[in-house]
Design a protein with these regions (language model features):
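Alpha-helical recognition segments enriched in aromatics with Gly/Pro capping
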Residues: 1-32, 47, 107, 127-341
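N-terminal, positively charged nucleic-acid-binding surface of large information/translation enzymes
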Residues: 8, 17-113
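Short, well-structured beta-strand/strand-turn elements
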Residues: 59-61, 141-147, 382
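Short, glycine/charge-rich beta-strand/loop segments that flank catalytic centers
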Residues: 63-69, 98-105, 115-130, 148-157
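The substrate-binding groove and active-site-proximal loops of carbohydrate-active enzymes
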Residues: 85-93, 119-124, 212
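Short catalytic-loop micro-motif centered on adjacent basic/acidic residues
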Residues: 117-121, 237-239, 383
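Structural preference for alpha-helix termini/caps and helix-kink/transition segments
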Residues: 279-282, 287-422
Length: 422
């Protein structure tokens, strides 16, 4: 399989550390609000990657975190913890907020046929792991204590800008006016590993540590969870493209300084979902969720179909007109598949030929739009019987996950008929 590796800025042959076995870590949601469909594009893409790896023969061990503490509004060390903001907004405890939005996120994943990973671990379940890593970073001189907080010293890691491909001057951007910059750091890009009450005295989630009662920084959480469950050598790390800096950059720095060697070989990032106002974002106040799409009469899998028609690394433009078109195509495809009837033995040669084409498309940097083209070619091919077509659809759908053979997923009403026939 070939994948675009953000670390090297090129498409490369994927070679795992252990033949036939892939260790894959994916950054999970910060559960302070509903996930919008832009967030969910990333999880759809990660789901496709995992299923594609399995389709072409790999065993995959995938881990995802749930960020329920430590993620600041500014994505660095600036502003308040997002969980604290949500707690104030909803007049609930941070734990109640996290539990509710984790449940909502899992429900959205189910509606989009995004498989729940083998291991899903909330950040708050792994405090001892973070303390162990931070202690070693301090002992080895990669971190320092300032105003009671522990920070990673980015000047001690000479490959700090490798993932982003930029330098300090490029990354010095204006700070949002509503966010107070952390003045305890020695250097602008140093980042928090552990915060004590000198950072926020109203933080609800706190734990004892060698440096005082407090809570972990956002970046240490993913490193700690990944190393705990997947070990010291990671094959693939995924996330949205805005995680390249600072989140994934900081993960690499602290992980490699802690381990003393390269940590992850392939970094796979997914493009934004853009609407008429640019990147879809919670900070803008209004955003689309799966529930909103359902309220407007859309099948969530029409959105998955839309994502499958695009290249994962590029931005995807969203509008209701575009989604209308995707839903029409999806429903026509599903109706065509459901019209197929078993009519004899499977043609093994034809099956293997199309199966290999599908694998080739997946191996070509997850070319899912080509996968859909191959599916349509199967349905149009008059030289193969319908039993063979059904078997191919069934296998292809282990990756596409569009419920193409599930009749109970079809809504039969006048609006649907209108959409299909337009």
């Amino acid at each position: 399989m070939k994948l675009y590796n953000t670390l090297t800025k090129k498409i490369e042959d994927f070679i795992p550390n252990k033949e036939g076995y892939v260790k894959m870590y994916t950054c999970g949601p910060t559960v302070y609000h509903f996930a919008h469909i832009g967030n969910l594009r990333t999880y759809i893409s990660e789901d496709i990657l995992e299923k594609a790896l399995k389709y072409v023969g790999y065993k995959v061990d995938r881990v995802m975190n749930i960020t329920d503490v430590g993620h600041m509004v500014g994505d660095g060390d600036s502003g308040e913890d997002k969980m604290l903001v949500a707690s104030k907004r909803e007049h609930k405890s941070s734990y109640e907020v996290a539990k509710y939005y984790t449940k909502c996120f899992k429900s959205d994943c189910e509606k989009l046929n995004v498989r729940w990973p083998d291991t899903v671990s909330p950040a708050t379940d792994n405090i001892d792991e973070y303390i162990k890593i931070i202690t070693k970073l301090l002992d080895d001189g990669y971190a320092y204590i300032s105003d009671g907080n522990v920070y990673f010293d980015t000047t001690k890691y000479d490959k700090y800008y490798e993932l982003s491909g930029r330098n300090a001057d490029d990354l010095m951007v204006a700070v949002r006016e509503d966010i107070k910059e952390d003045t305890s750091k020695k250097n602008p890009f140093d980042f928090g590993l552990w915060f004590t009450n000198s950072k926020f005295n109203n933080q609800e989630m706190q734990w004892d540590s060698p440096w005082g009662r407090g809570y972990p920084g956002w970046h240490i959480e993913c490193s700690g969870i990944s190393i705990k469950y997947l070990g010291e050598n990671l094959d693939i790390h995924c996330g949205a493209e805005d995680a390249v800096f600072p989140h994934h950059t900081n993960e690499i720095a602290q992980s490699e300084c802690y381990l003393g060697h390269k940590w992850c070989n392939y970094w796979v990032h997914f493009g934004f979902l853009n609407d008429k106002n640019g990147k879809m974002s919670k900070s803008k106040g209004e955003f689309l969720t799966v529930s909103v799409l359902e309220e407007k009469g859309y099948n969530p899998l029409a959105y998955r179909y839309l994502c499958l028609n695009s290249y994962y690394h590029n931005a995807l433009t969203f509008s209701y007109e575009i989604l209308d078109g995707a839903e029409r195509e999806y429903l026509k495809l599903k109706n065509k598949v459901l019209s197929l009837k078993e009519d004899g033995e499977i043609d093994t040669d034809k099956f293997n030929s199309y199966d290999n084409k599908f694998k080739e498309a997946l191996n070509n940097n997850l070319n899912t739009s080509m996968c859909l083209t191959i599916l349509y070619d199967v349905l149009k091919d008059n030289s193969i019987n319908e039993s063979t077509k059904i078997s191919l659809v069934q296998k292809f759908d282990t990756v596409l996950s569009l419920d193409l053979l599930k009749e109970n997923n079809v809504v039969v009403d006048k609006e649907l008929e209108r959409k299909v026939n337009e």
